A protein has these predicted regions:
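A solvent-exposed interaction/effector surface
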Residues: 2-205
């Protein structure tokens, strides 16, 4: 199933479901989210670093800059803009996370200023979604890395997690950072080569 089809299916559901779960090492309670496997193609992209505390406004400005550069270089755009987390939420503290805006393209792209050209690896990904915007990403990370991946005996393949923003509503009197958005997340995953502890299971079988 294509990534966009999976996202649309998630958007049509009540995305967050089930009783909250306590995840070891996480503060408070974390909800349960829909998640499933999808396959992404390897490709190239224009990328631009984002501030760690970026907003929707800053994200839009970065997307616009990448789109303008793609038009100047006559590069076909192959997907909607995305942003990526360069890090492992299960291992790296939030103050070490780095984000960048990503515009998938084809053709002979050239770097310009702080915009670079990168290879975006494909392969199997776990696709999930939160309808609660940027502020709920940490909760989604905790669910995926603390519960979903261990339950499937999977682990992060590489520390590069893609995200796509979907507008849910935008009223004329609302600011850009108050727009209701859903965030789709794509985690590159692989079967674990060593036993992965599952919350709630005893270490002794």
């Amino acid at each position: 199933m294509a990534a966009d089809e999976i996202t649309q299916k998630h958007l049509q559901r009540q995305r967050v479901r089930g009783a909250p779960s306590t995840i070891p090492g996480a503060g408070g309670m974390v909800g349960s989210y829909d998640a499933e496997e999808t396959w992404r193609q390897t490709g190239r992209a224009l990328v631009l670093p984002l501030e760690r505390s970026f907003t929707l406004q800053g994200l839009r400005e970065s997307y616009a800059r990448l789109t303008e550069l793609a038009e100047q270089q006559k590069l076909p755009v192959t997907e909607e803009p995305m942003f990526a987390l360069k890090g492992d939420p299960n291992e790296d503290p939030p103050h070490k996370w780095e984000y960048e805006a990503v515009l998938p393209i084809r053709g002979g792209a050239k770097p310009e200023g702080d915009v670079t050209v990168a290879r975006i690896q494909g392969g199997m990904h776990i696709a999930s979604l939160t309808p609660r915007g940027l502020g709920d990403l940490k909760g989604l990370y905790v669910y995926l890395f603390g519960k979903f991946l261990p339950s499937k005996k999977q682990q992060l393949m590489r520390p590069y997690i893609l995200h796509r923003v979907h507008l849910l509503s935008e009223g004329p009197e609302r600011g850009l950072d108050d727009v209701a958005v859903a965030i789709a997340v794509y985690v590159p995953a692989v079967l674990s080569i060593k036993p992965v502890p599952v919350p709630g299971e005893s270490a002794e079988a």
